[in-house]
Structures are given as structure tokens and as C-alpha cells.
A protein has these predicted regions:
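Extended beta-strand/beta-hairpin segments
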Residues: 1-52, 59-139
């Protein structure tokens, strides 16, 4: 299986603009620029897309890992925060904030252990060479 995304960029780094499109067309010539990446411009940016991909992948991996333990997942809400070091121009880490509804028969310690395993086995986690941290709110 292959997934495809395309990017087009025109102009200098600070004044130029670009568009990102995905095979599914969920992103279809979606605007990105220096301002959307490093300021508050309208559009997306590569780091935001990584965060979205990681949050989605982790949530699915957690659901699958819970099912592997014969546990049905309740609501899973994940926020991924990508840390960008502007001096080094590199991503230095990603933090996953997980909020999940109480699942009958699973205590918080077991759930946290399962979530940590899902973090490790998530396909996007495996693709990234940065520290990935996790905090869990199990209510």
C-alpha cells in the first residue's frame, strides 16, 4: 500500500506560497507558506500535518491494542503537540495528550501501560526519529 501527497512551492522561502494535495483529496491545493508555518497565517504547515497524522495514528493504534487485550475502546481524544526548535530548525519531540473515557474492567495503571505500548507501536511513531512522550487522563 502506498499513500501519496504532493506539494508545490513557488517563490522565496519568506515570500513564496505553496499548496499541498493528498491522494484522498481531503487536502486539495491546501495553502501553506512561511507565515502559516512560522507565524499565524491562514493555511497549514508540515508540522501541523505531522501532528494530525500522529494523533490519528496513535488513536487508532490504541483502539487496536485495546481490542488485542479484549477491551472495547470508549471515546479516545488525542492531541499531538510537535516541538519545533527554531534555532536548529528541527523537530525535537512530540507530546501526545490522551483523554479517554473509563472502560469497565480496566484500571488506570493497566490502561496507561496499554496506551504506552500503542505509542511505541503506532506506525507514525515508528517513522519519526524524535522523543515521543505521553500523558493520560483517564476519567
Amino acid at each position: 500500500m502506498k499513500r501519496i501527497a504532493k506539494a508545490h512551492w513557488n517563490g522565496t522561502l519568506q515570500e513564496g506560497t505553496g499548496e499541498i494535495s493528498t491522494q484522498s483529496t481531503v487536502l486539495n491545493q491546501t495553502q501553506y507558506s512561511f507565515k502559516t508555518r512560522f507565524a499565524d497565517g491562514i493555511g497549514t504547515n508540515p508540522e501541523e500535518l505531522i501532528a494530525g497524522a500522529h494523533a490519528g495514528c496513535f488513536s487508532m493504534a490504541l483502539s487496536a491494542t485495546l481490542a488485542h487485550h479484549n477491551i472495547t475502546a470508549g471515546d479516545i481524544f488525542t492531541t499531538a503537540t510537535v516541538d519545533l526548535d527554531m534555532q536548529a530548525l528541527s523537530i525535537t519531540g512530540i507530546h501526545l495528550d490522551l483523554q479517554a473515557s473509563v472502560i469497565e474492567g480496566v484500571d488506570e495503571a493497566t490502561f496507561t501501560e496499554i496506551a504506552d505500548g500503542a505509542k511505541t507501536h503506532c506506525i507514525i511513531s515508528k517513522a519519526l526519529n524524535v522523543p515521543i512522550t505521553l500523558s493520560v487522563v483517564y476519567a
